């Protein structure tokens, strides 16, 4: 069990479900429960699942300089956000290399909340805010309960007026079970889902109520590792597990470009003035690898670190993998040489498995993103 400095208000709930509360981002996190991860994956893909993702870093930036601070730090045009709108963004270093991703929520005219993963973007923003008219608050009282899956909206519609009309990447302030919450139509699953931001004191009651009243919808508690299964299918990267910080280059320091990661879409069209912009644009066409999918033969999942071979030489490495009993496919995300990143290139997997595979475009599931953006 982790000796973490951040404590989830749902700690006792997770322990009761069989979690050992392994550390992530400084918080004891329910990576697994006593129940089967395949059941968690199936619930989120076919019904809905509830997950505690409070280990995400939630930081408020408030003041006259908040917008300009975030606009320079991220790849998005922050000025286009209005209160109630959010956007997925990346943060780069001066070398144009990826250091973090985040969601930026505009909560007021001069107020933003940034939700980070495990990169170093928060620390960079703290340094950049020094001497500027912006207050920074790391908010660990705020908990994040993620309700994901096709039935999530049906359940919430019984309790939150207007939730069906909330567009993708928008949020609203409301009440859930008579407790104040911010509900955001975001998630990390590829499904239509919602993140429920609430006070720590309210998190256990909201968690319990969703699971109790959501039984008729098939809602179950889901462990953090289920996200790995979902993200493989939906092409969602997880720093540092897909990055050169985990799989280092032989002769270069760690640091991946957005072109290599397939995250260049996060740069707002025409935006030039952001940290690392010059190097970002210069590095286009100089990809050392590409993130791409791998479809494996058989009914077993590979493991991170398994190598990929083509014509007798190593051409890549698997970073995350899963087997879906819903589709009966064994799938993986991989770092491969650029010429291998084409549909159908034959591969051999070596390591925990020894099997044939092919390079496969990402995402495997819902490539047009119709599920997560559905209306009504």
Swiss-Prot record:
It comes from the Bacteria. One of its GO terms (cellular component) is cytosol. Keywords: Aminotransferase, Transferase. Pfam families: GCV_T (PF01571), GCV_T_C (PF08669). Disulfide bonds: none annotated. SUPFAM superfamilies: Aminomethyltransferase beta-barrel domain, Folate-binding domain. Its EC number is 2.1.2.-. GO terms for molecular function: transaminase activity. The keyword Repressor does not apply. The keyword Nucleotide-binding does not apply. It is an enzyme of class 2 (transferase). The heme-dependent oxidative N-demethylase (HODM) is a heterotetramer composed of a catalytic alpha subunit, a FMN/2Fe-2S-dependent oxidoreductase beta subunit, a gamma subunit with putative aminotransferase activity, and a delta subunit of unknown function. Component of the heme-dependent oxidative N-demethylase (HODM) enzyme, that catalyzes the NADPH-dependent oxidation of dimethylamine (DMA) to methylamine (MA) and formaldehyde. Functions in bacterial methylated amine catabolism, linking alkylamine oxidation to the tetrahydrofolate C1 pool. The gamma subunit of HODM may act as an aminomethyltransferase involved in the detoxification of formaldehyde released by the alpha subunit; this process requires tetrahydrofolate (THF). This is Heme-dependent oxidative N-demethylase gamma subunit.
